[in-house]
Regions:
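Glycine-rich phosphate-binding loop of actin/hexokinase-like ATP-binding domains
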Residues: 212-254
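Glycine-rich phosphate-binding/hydrolytic loop that grips phosphoryl groups
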Residues: 357, 361-405
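Nucleotide/phosphate-binding catalytic cleft detector across ATP-hydrolyzing
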Residues: 1-26, 30-215, 233-234, 244, ...
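Glycine-rich phosphate-binding loops at beta-strand->alpha-helix junctions
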Residues: 171, 271-273, 328-349
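Hydrophobic alpha-helical bundle architecture
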Residues: 318-336, 351, 355-363
Length: 406
């Protein structure tokens, strides 16, 4: 057992794990088989999603249908039946706080048991959570037994007094309820509710990047999530409800063409950095109300795209400047479907005046940032250890259940 990522209690697993990412543009499912900690993706599903707006569920039935379509695709490819999933939770209105608890060890022998770990986690959660919020996760970071600090797993040790130090994440009840409702209505159980930026920062960055501090910007279809990890902890998240769909809408409005045409133009000819494009390269655009296609040059399309991408990135810069995040040495990592746009790294480097790189998953058939979240949900869920699971059942409403997920 090793502790990767300061605080997130991880261990290598064997078994089957399923990740579910309910995005604004699409719902992604990944089935992964772990053999002694080695991950092998055996099934993928990706279904168009119409039930979300700006990252939030607005139509439960449509979201349920998209989940079922994505699950069916993954089941067919993997040749298994999916009964339960690990589902990503967006960072909207997420709050992060440190917590600590202290107890007297209960058994007469003074040997620390699972029950003591659960009790000390309960003591750390004695706080008033506002009625509209609920605890999403508690992550034990270390324990102190009779003054001995830095213990990662105190079970089996002897002690009279035990303390736990950790981090607690809370989120809005409405968002959590709607996600649970959609998954359950789709006929699936939930193993882990995983905070997506927590899984993402934990699994796509190196130990050094997590330790010294790095910014991760996840550019989705409906929203952009900016996260900061430092000292191996997710310290900050911010959600801007603008994403790749807004770029498509801008193209549609400016060029007076349908949303589907605009999406095709963005994918086939789009570039976020006009300096890299040519005003002489032209392509035909079907314009509403005109019988003949209109010729549009690459540079003009790029300027439309640049305006929106710049606005999205500048909003991230504003919130990051407030917390001096650009002083962290890890620079900026971009990911998410909208980040696959050519030229986006150049533009981001110009805006942030920092080192920027694009993260692309390194799995065959999934080498697209659109799959970064769903893969990280699987990896994160598979690596959670016993201490995490014991502490989790200190959260009101959590019932003890196995970690595996098929």
């Amino acid at each position: 057992l090793e502790l990767i990522g300061g605080g997130i209690p991880f261990m290598a697993k064997t078994g089957m794990y399923v990740g579910l990412d309910i995005g604004t543009t699409s719902v992604k499912v990944v089935v992964a088989e772990y053999i002694e900690g080695q991950m092998n993706i055996i099934g993928v599903g990706n279904a168009k999603s119409d039930g979300l707006n700006r990252g939030i569920v607005v139509d439960i039935d449509q979201t349920v249908q998209a989940i079922q379509r994505a699950v069916r695709q993954a089941e067919e490819k993997a040749g298994i039946q999916i009964k339960s999933v690990n589902v990503g939770l967006p960072a909207n209105l997420l709050e992060v706080e440190s917590c600590q608890g202290m107890i007297a060890v209960s058994s007469e022998s003074k040997e620390i048991t699972d029950e003591d770990v659960r009790n000390v986690a309960s003591a750390a959660l004695v706080r008033s959570t506002p009625p509209e919020r609920q605890i999403v996760a508690i992550l034990p970071q270390d324990f102190t037994v009779d003054g001995f600090e830095g213990i990662k797993d105190p079970r089996g040790m002897l002690g009279v007094r035990m303390e736990m130090f950790g981090v607690v994440y809370t989120g809005p009840k409405t968002i959590i309820h709607n996600i649970r409702k959609c998954v359950e209505k789709a006929g699936l159980g939930i193993n882990e509710l995983v905070i997506t930026p927590l899984a993402l920062t934990e699994t796509i960055l190196t130990d050094g990047e997590k330790d010294f501090g790095t910014i991760v910007i996840d550019m989705g279809g409906g929203q952009t999530t900016t996260s900061v990890i430092h000292d191996k902890q997710l310290k900050f998240t911010h959600v801007n409800q603008e994403g790749g769909e807004f770029i498509t809408k801008d193209i549609s409005i400016v060029l007076n063409t349908s949303f589907n045409n605009a999406e095709a133009l963005k994918i086939n000819y789009g570039d976020a950095y006009p300096e890299r494009t040519s005003a002489n390269e032209e392509f035909p655009v079907d314009v509403i109300g005109k019988s003949e296609p209109v010729r549009v040059d690459e540079r003009y399309l790029s300027e439309i795209i640049e305006a929106r991408v710049e606005q999205i990135l500048r909003k991230s810069k504003e919130v990051l400047d407030e917390i001096d995040a650009f002083e962290l040495p890890g620079g900026v990592v971009l990911t998410g479907g909208a980040a696959s746009m050519p030229g986006i790294v150049d533009l981001a480097q110009e805006i942030f005046e920092a080192n920027v790189k694009l993260y692309v998953p390194n799995h065959m058939g999934l080498r697209n940032p659109v799959f970064a979240n769903v893969i990280s949900i699987v990896e994160y869920s598979a690596q959670l250890n016993d201490i995490y699971h014991i502490a989790k059942y200190a959260i009101p409403g959590e019932k003890s259940k196995p970690a595996q997920s098929v």
